[in-house]
Amino acid sequence: MKIEKLIIKDFRSHALTKVNFSSGINLIIGQNGSGKSSILDALLVGLYWPSKPKDLKKDDFERINGSGTEITVFFEKGNVKYQIHRNIGRGLAFVKYHDGSSWKTLETGQKPVRDWMEKLVPYDVFLNAIYIRQGEIDAILESDESREKVVRQVLGLDRYENSYKNLLDVRKEIDARIKAIEDYLKSTENIDELIGNLEKELTSVLREINEISPKLPELRGELGGLEKELKELEKTAEELAKARVELKSEEGNLRELEAKKSGIQSMIRETEKRVEELKEKVKELESLEEKAKEYERLSRFYRNFTEGINRIEKLLATYSQQAENLRERIDELSKKEARVKELLKEKEGLQKELGALEEDLKAYQRAKELMANLERLKKRLTLSEEEIEKLEAEIQKARERKEEIMKELEEIGSRRGELKSIAGERNKALMELKKAKGRCPVCGRELTEEHRKELLEKYTAELKEISAEMKELEKREKKLRAELVEVEKTLKKERELFALKEVLEQIRETEEKLKEYDLEKLEEANEKAEELKKKLAGLEGEIKSLEDEIKKGELLKKKLALVEKKLRELEEERASLLGELKKLGFGDVKELEERLKELEPAYKRYIELRPARDELKREEDLLKSLKLDLTAILKEIEKTSKRVEELRKRVEELEKSYDKDRHEELKGKTRELSNELAGLEARLKSLEERRDEVKASLEKLREEKETRKEKAKELEKLKKARERVQRLREKVKAYKNLLKEGALAKVGEMASEIFEELTEEKYSGVTVKAEENKVRLGVVYNGKEYGLGFLSGGERIALGLAFRLALSLYLAGEISLLILDEPTPYLDEERRRRLVDIMQRYLRKIPQVIVVSHDEELKDAADRVIRVSLENGVSVVREAEVG
């Protein structure tokens, strides 16, 4: 697999990032927090989202205020080019391949694309064999158990472990099936006995069915004759009962009709009496009709007249008052015009006084700005003048101390190089002395055991002295570097010092400028100007108010004309109403009121009698309707009387033809025969059902007997399969251990070479030993094996890195891509330089390597350098030149 290009949009600090990768070593470099590791996380999300990686959640990587995360990965696998695109926010995804001319879609949708990628390169293979993550070195150094877990994941030994466990599950499943079959065979041991018992029961049931079947036709024939005679008697009894009920009903109807006839005759008499009374009332009503009409006409006029006069009187009073008020306001306007002229003259004088103060006001404004600026500058000055001078002296002292420290560190580095060279020579001499025979490889004379021992002791003592001096140098270097950090902190304050000095100079300049102004005089001028402005504003407000009122003068005159017109119209309306009163023959309202009082009794009697006409009409209609009802009821009584006579004759005839005793006798005989027949039929049905059940049970038992034979054969096969599965489990376990030991032996050899490079051959090898659920790691020093506790902190990190690189290099024949995320944490400067040589020597065996780091030294080993920086909160990617 080879990664060609990665496009990232709105992922953490990346707004829109495009990264191109090539064959060889690709280095992604940048400071912590610049977004370089986010490129690797985006690659994982692009390939395996949504279920992998599990520790990445959508909210963790979506860019704030972004339009939505999108990732596109272009890569090659098996000489075929692919691209995977994911739009996380919208839940869209696709994978395409290039057929040589254009891109063709393979899958769409987040889950289908993830499943396709999982088949092409399983996530566990990518994460364990291809991707060396931050913190994985710590897991290698943490314990023998955690180291074994890393080895198991990277080498893919989990597959064999899972196979071993899965085979145990298979064996358990086979055991469960064996037990189930054995239980089944035991539970069906008596099947032949059950078949014999059911065959006997079937013979007995068939015999009883043959005895009952002939009796049923005879009983059914006898019962049919009785039921026919019984049916005829029941029909006669039913007709008799129906005739009696109908007769009783008709007799009741006849009584009701007679009662209705009497009621209607009584109502006719009462209605005729009311009709005569109402005719007299209608005559009186007609005699009062003329007076009633006059009363209604005069009453309407009186109501309209009084309402109109009252309304006019009220409006006349209102409009008269308005006219008086308007005339007074118009008279006041001339006084206000004179007042406006006085105020304008006063305003002109104030404006002249304010103009004379203009220059002083401008000077006062400039002085205020200088004072405000001085206040701001003093707030920015965080140190006093004495403290600034003290800080300047500290920085000068720190600059001198830094030169001294750098010079001493250079001397320490030079001395360490000399000691390493001597130690290398002594180690080489020791190795040669241990292997040498005959002549001494040091001096060339004959090599005796005494001479060998003497030289070995001498060189070993020298190596111990060198080691002690190296530790002292390392201790001194550590102390100097710690001091250098503090010195650098002081030197970083130099920029702050420059800024403070500049602020101090600005304060002095501002104070000098302020001395040029007479602030007391300028403040008095400003106060006077404010007072004048206040007076001027008051005058302008009063002038505007008066001018607005003067403008309203014409409107007031127009309004007065309208009010006077309205008063004339109201007077005319009042005169018109009085004219109508005279036309009716009345001199004033009192005469009209007296005439109404005179007509009122006749009008009230008229109102009282007015409903009589309608009542007379209703009563006459009712009388007519009652007479029609009476005629109809008389006809119905005659008809019902005839029906009652006919029904009485029909009942007498039916009573003569019906024999009640014979009816009861037939009921008893029919019931007895029906019960006997039902009992035999029920018994026959029960026997037939039992016959069918026994036959079905026999069929099932015979099938069960055949099944028993098949199960017995299956049991033998399962027992043999269990033995084969157990043998296969043992083989899988043995092969896993063999593979693990062989792989760790090769990994140990490669780790030894890398570790020797990292420690400049201080250690002559790395030991790797596999145990149950453990992998022990050690080093060889001066021919002896030591545990990890023998190593310094930096050497432990170097060993962990060497071991993890060896694991990936072991798989180099199977993988074409390796990713390292921050491989240099805790490595000192010298070991980082050694790592560059290791990358050039070993990692070039892998077609494509992607390294993420903040160490500039790694650039020397890279074929392509991609620099990541954070600018205004956004990650920016640039390709850098390779030296």
From Swiss-Prot:
| One Pfam family recorded for the sequence | AAA_21
| Coiled coil region boundaries | 218-420, 452-585, 620-741
The GO annotation for biological process reads:
DNA repair; double-strand break repair
CC cofactor: Zn(2+)
Q: Which residues bind ATP?
A: 12, 32-38, 134, 790-795
Note on cofactor = Binds 1 zinc ion per homodimer.
Q: Where are the transmembrane segments?
A: none
| UniProt entry keywords in alphabetical sequence | ATP-binding, Coiled coil, DNA damage, DNA repair, Hydrolase, Metal-binding, Nucleotide-binding, Zinc
Could you tell me which InterPro entries the record lists for this protein? AAA+_ATPase, ATPase_AAA_core, P-loop_NTPase, Rad50/SbcC_AAA, Rad50_ATPase_archaeal, Zn_hook_RAD50
Say if the entry is tagged with keyword Oxidoreductase.
Answer: no
Q: Which GO terms describe its molecular function?
A: ATP binding; ATP hydrolysis activity; DNA exonuclease activity; zinc ion binding
- Name the GO cellular-component terms: DNA repair complex
Task: Specify whether Ubl conjugation is a keyword of the entry.
Answer: no
The Zinc-hook domain is annotated at 395-492
- Which positions in this protein are listed as binding Zn(2+)? 440, 443
Q: Which domain of life is it from?
A: Archaea
Quaternary organization: Homodimer. Forms a heterotetramer composed of two Mre11 subunits and two Rad50 subunits.
What is stated as this protein's family in its record? Belongs to the SMC family. RAD50 subfamily.
Give a short account of what the protein does.
Part of the Rad50/Mre11 complex, which is involved in the early steps of DNA double-strand break (DSB) repair. The complex may facilitate opening of the processed DNA ends to aid in the recruitment of HerA and NurA. Rad50 controls the balance between DNA end bridging and DNA resection via ATP-dependent structural rearrangements of the Rad50/Mre11 complex.
**Entry comment, domain topic:** The two conserved Cys that bind zinc constitute the zinc-hook, which separates the large intramolecular coiled coil regions. The 2 Cys residues coordinate one molecule of zinc with the help of the 2 Cys residues of the zinc-hook of another Rad50 molecule, thereby forming a V-shaped homodimer.
Specify the protein name. DNA double-strand break repair Rad50 ATPase
Q: Which species?
A: Thermococcus kodakarensis (strain ATCC BAA-918 / JCM 12380 / KOD1) (Pyrococcus kodakaraensis (strain KOD1))
Which gene is the coding source of this polypeptide chain?
rad50
